[in-house]
């Protein structure tokens, strides 16, 4: 099982998050985003969550106003990818507390961090939500401590200049 790309697309077609696990040119990425987002957005809610696209499978799931889209190889299991998408949404939900599109817009780096704790090179790295969230929260605490130390050093530096 190897995910080639992971996209979060709004109903209006705006990309909110894009993670690529294969090397592609910017033109190729833009074409894939354009094609896949228009393909997924236009589908009716009762339709299947799997679509074929240029020899690959597109697996998607809609949560509220966002489409979570994964591109996978033809022989990969779609149901496992749906579970990976669901696990990612659950982690985001726990981290942000009922995640919404605005959380992802204004805190996209945190969403990427959650994704990177969950997936590694397109493979599921950690299946435990607790472990993913504890790693993310530990990273938050560390960056907060660094920010406090930096502000303290700036304060001490400004006092010394006086």
Curated annotation (Swiss-Prot):
Compartments, as annotated in UniProt: Cytoplasm; Nucleus; Cytoplasmic vesicle, Clathrin-coated vesicle membrane; Endosome
A biological process from GO: retrograde transport, endosome to Golgi
One Gene Ontology CC term in the entry: endosome
Family affiliation: Belongs to the adaptor complexes small subunit family.
Principal location listed in the UniProt entry: cytoplasm
Keywords (A to Z) from UniProt: Cytoplasm, Cytoplasmic vesicle, Endosome, Golgi apparatus, Membrane, Nucleus, Protein transport, Transport
InterPro entries, per database record: AP1_sigma (IPR044733), AP_complex_ssu (IPR016635), AP_mu_sigma_su (IPR022775), Longin-like_dom_sf (IPR011012)
Cited Pfam families: Clat_adaptor_s
Effects seen without this gene: Leads to hypersensitivity to valproic acid.
Protein name per its UniProtKB record: AP-1 complex subunit sigma-1
GO MF annotation terms: clathrin adaptor activity; clathrin binding
Keyword Nucleus: yes
Organism: Schizosaccharomyces pombe (strain 972 / ATCC 24843)
Keyword Cell membrane: no
Assembly and interaction partners: Adaptor protein complex 1 (AP-1) is a heterotetramer composed of two large adaptins (gamma-type subunit apl4 and beta-type subunit apl2), a medium adaptin (mu-type subunit apm1) and a small adaptin (sigma-type subunit aps1). AP-1 interacts with clathrin.
Reported function: Component of the AP-1 complex which links clathrin to receptors in coated vesicles. Clathrin-associated protein complexes are believed to interact with the cytoplasmic tails of membrane proteins, leading to their selection and concentration.
Gene name, Swiss-Prot/TrEMBL: vas2
């Amino acid at each position: 099982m190897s995910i080639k790309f992971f996209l979060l697309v709004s109903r209006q077609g705006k990309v909110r998050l894009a993670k690529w696990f294969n090397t592609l040119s910017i033109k190729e990425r833009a074409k894939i985003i354009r094609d896949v987002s228009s393909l997924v957005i236009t589908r009716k809610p009762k339709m299947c969550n799997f679509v074929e696209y240029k020899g690959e499978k597109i697996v998607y799931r809609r949560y509220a106003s966002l489409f979570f889209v994964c591109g996978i190889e033809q022989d990969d299991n779609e149901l496992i990818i749906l579970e990976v998408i669901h696990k990612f949404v659950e982690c985001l939900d726990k981290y942000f507390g009922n995640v919404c599109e605005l959380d992802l817009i204004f805190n996209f780096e945190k969403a990427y961090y959650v994704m990177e704790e969950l997936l590694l090179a397109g493979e599921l790295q950690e299946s435990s939500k607790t472990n993913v969230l504890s790693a993310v929260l530990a990273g938050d605490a560390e960056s907060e401590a660094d920010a406090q130390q930096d502000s303290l050093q700036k304060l001490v530096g400004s006092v010394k200049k006086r």
